[in-house]
Amino acid sequence: FDTWWLSAQSAFRQNGTAVASIAMRARNRIYVRGYDELLLPHLAEALNSNPGCRKLIVLHLTGSHEPVCSNWPRDKAVFKPLDTEEVCYDNSIHYTDSLLGQVFAMLETRRASVMYFSDHGLEYDPTKEHVYFHGGIKPSQQAYHVPMFIWYSPTLGEHVDRQTVNSVFSTAYNDYLINAWMGVTRPAQPKTPEEVITRWQGKSDVFDANHNVFNYKALRNSFK
């Protein structure tokens, strides 16, 4: 694979983190200052480089990370008035959705697939000054609610199995899922995304910022 790491989060911010160690292994690394959409020209560059070479391209987005009102352009607002973090959060989701639509359009005629997921969720407490925040300590289930899906280009046709997973699936098993999705096989590990999901769906152990392990199903539903 020709590997690309395209990030809207600064390299300095990631120094010394697990994310930085992963990013440093990519053959090509590009960091931008600004909104997530600034990554799209670099995605086009990556797609058009080395024709015929298989590629793994990581788009490291800011998304709806707090401070949520700062992470998307105000001229893209569809929900108004912009006077609460709740409205900013809704607009940030719409902005990311629009961005993903542009990514899919760039890949529509290619033999390509996209795996999308967030690394963590956000807690919500309307009584706080900043109503969205990390659930690092004493988390509720909200802290672990993240979007995740695999999209396949129409050019792949009937070569993929499309389904919806209607049970808990932890991103703790994404290492196995990504391997299977990319066609990387290892002894005694599932060989397809469907096999990974079948083996680990319903598993509900999670951990917090202090590496304390909890049963997700035993956590309270929300922070407040």
Segment roles from a protein language model:
Residues F1-A77, H145, T171, Y176-G202:
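Active-site-proximal alpha/beta segments of enzymes that process anionic O-linked groups
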Residues A11-N15, T62-R110, K128, G136-P147:
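Active-site-proximal cap/lid insertion segments
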Residues A20-R27, R74-T84, H130-G135, L156-H159:
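Short glycine/proline- and charge-enriched loop/turn segments
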Residues V32-D36, E85, Y89-T96, Q163-T171:
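Aromatic-acidic/polar surface patches that form glycan- and anion
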Residues P41-E45, Y132-I137:
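Alpha-helical scaffolding within the catalytic cores
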Residues A105-L107, K128, I137-P139, I150-K224:
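Membrane-interface soluble catalytic domains
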